[in-house]
Amino acid sequence: MIFLAIIGTFIFYLFYEENINFKPQSISLAQIISFLKGNKKISNFALITFFNLLANNFTANLFIIFVSNYLGLKDYAGYLLILYFTITLISTPLWYFFGKNFSNMYLLQLGTIITIFGFFFVAFTSANNWELYMLVIFITGIGIGVDLIIPQIELADILDNNKDNRLSQIFTSFFSIIRKAAIGVAAGIALTGYGYLENVGFSLILDIPNIMIFYFIVPISIKIIVLILVMRYRSKFHVSVRG
């Protein structure tokens, strides 16, 4: 089971890790500021990217713990993790082909809504009705599939408007740092925070297990923030449903 869990974790990081071997030439701060002023989508999209990955990685880091300890499915945790990533992987090309007729941000909004809807059922899962968690895996797997492709396409579209390849490289690297920061922050808070509270026997909210706070309440709250940010982005930059 440990081997299966390792495989599942590897697949997850494979999705999000990026190769940034290129080394852009030096560029002035004035050019960067000028580019930001001329393309206000960058800062708004950076916030969406950070919080979206933050929410996703909260659940990814605590998946095994939630399934093993809270649902009591220790022997099946690795299989469920692989099932989740398999559904996500299968749904990714479907989002791509489906998305050809729609705008990127509309698809991201739709995927976020699907994820929030599916993840909401976590509130009703327990060791006595763990079967409900299979529905969570299926729905959220489809919703998260959009996060593996659409944000990258949207970023590419934003940077395509810039004729200076060096600036594009800098902001591609910048977004890579944002992604890695989100992964690191999520891992630090989720694993360290939850682990510490469990070790000292302290509950953040009375009658609510800490694992439900870190695995469910925090991520779904962040996802709702992401949904609001995406909707504001579409409204601010007049992004229609159709691409």
For each predicted feature, which ranges?
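Intracellular loop-helix junctions on the cytosolic face of multi-pass helical membrane proteins
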Residues: 1-64, 68-69, 73, 209-243
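C-terminal ends and interior cores of transmembrane alpha-helices
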Residues: 113-131
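Transmembrane alpha-helix termini and helix-breaking/packing motifs in multi-pass membrane transporters
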Residues: 1, 183-208
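Loop-to-transmembrane helix entry/capping segments in MFS-fold secondary transporters
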Residues: 74-75, 162-178
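Residue-level signature of mid-helix packing/kink "hotspots" within the transmembrane helices
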Residues: 85-93, 184
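Helix-to-loop junctions at the C-terminal end of transmembrane segments
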Residues: 90-106
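Juxtamembrane helix-start elements in MFS-like secondary transporters
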Residues: 73-81, 129, 133, 211
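Hydrophobic core of transmembrane alpha-helices in multi-pass small-molecule transporters
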Residues: 130-148, 154
